[in-house]
């Protein structure tokens, strides 16, 4: 790869230090695990270049960009608990499926240029005529800025609190 080519380059002057981050899509993972090991101790680091696979580029093509490029990634997990039962008995139920659907809709509305929130997993159980007691949601939140990340997390908490108050779930 690139490291091998640079190491073999006779005109290259300097020290090249290659880092490979483990579990970059996991939490905790990626750079936080690497940096916890203090890999730069004893080195005078003048530049760090990050690389990530970009499926929109042709194989063998490198893309460069100054500044922020890859966002932070938070894994989100939610549980909506209600009182399930037979679908014909809706007035007696506290439907977590309906509440979860509204919650997902409100979460997705938080998306904008500096934030990407996705729900990639919804698990409920039940049957065609049975409303489950609980719905599980999982997704990711990606932001470029720590302050923006904190703001979105607070908005998520506010939405959850408001829905809890409105639905009794």
Tell where the protein language model's regions lie, with residue ranges.
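Histidine/acidic-residue-rich, glycine-tolerant segments that coordinate divalent metal ions
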Residues: 6-121, 126-130
């Amino acid at each position: 790869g690139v490291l091998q080519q640079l190491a073999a380059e006779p005109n290259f002057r300097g020290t090249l230090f290659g880092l490979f981050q483990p579990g970059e899509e996991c939490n905790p993972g990626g750079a936080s695990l690497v940096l916890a090991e203090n890999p730069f101790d004893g080195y005078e680091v003048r530049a760090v270049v990050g690389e990530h696979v970009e499926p929109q580029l042709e194989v063998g093509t490198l893309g460069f960009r100054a500044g922020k490029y890859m966002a932070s990634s938070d894994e989100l997990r939610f549980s909506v608990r209600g009182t399930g039962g037979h679908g014909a008995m809706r007035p007696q139920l506290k439907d977590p499926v309906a509440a979860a659907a509204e919650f997902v809709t409100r979460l997705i509305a938080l998306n904008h240029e500096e934030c990407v929130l996705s729900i990639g997993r919804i698990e409920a159980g039940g049957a065609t005529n049975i409303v489950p007691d609980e719905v599980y949601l999982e997704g990711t939140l990606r932001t470029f800025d720590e302050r923006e990340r904190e703001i979105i997390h607070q908005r998520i908490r506010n939405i959850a609190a408001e829905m809890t108050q409105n639905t009794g779930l």
